[in-house]
Amino acid sequence: MWISLKPILKYRGGKQREIPDFIDRVPRKYHRYFEPFLGGGAVYFYLEPEQAVVGDVNRKLITFYQQLRDQYPLMRRQLDELQRQYEENQTEYEALKAQYPDEHCENRNEALYYRIRAQYNHPTRELLEGVTYFFINKTAYSGMIRYNSSGEYNVPFGRYRHLNANAVTRAHSELLR
């Protein structure tokens, strides 16, 4: 029986659901694990290899994992603050919708999303790039990855009720070391 971490990110083509179909074919002992297409990391986090070489062509994805590995305390603080803001905004929005069910009510998470998306496209020092990547991954419409002709991420807000920043754990950070 394998004991495993869950993947942190939604990723198109992720293998989390397929793992039961092939895990019996994975050797239990090996010297080093190689993962050239890390993506959401479902297999990597499931196996929790002691020695691994991982990569991906998506620079922002790799930056997320590098910052998770190297700057976990700062990432954790920034994610906790975004989580707090998101929950506060959602509570306010749901209260407004309950009070005015037939009215259009502002969801401040939408403005928060577009502010973070702007930072994703034009990084500032306000947030780690990995934090903006995680936030976009969890709050964009259907978790889509799409860029316009200028190379800017342009997926709209997904209107999710929850942001689970607790998916990012110290155990994930330590495994990446």
Q: For each predicted feature, which ranges?
A:
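S-adenosyl-L-methionine
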Residues: M1-F37, A42-V43, L47
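Class I S-adenosyl-L-methionine-dependent methyltransferase module
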Residues: E50-R177
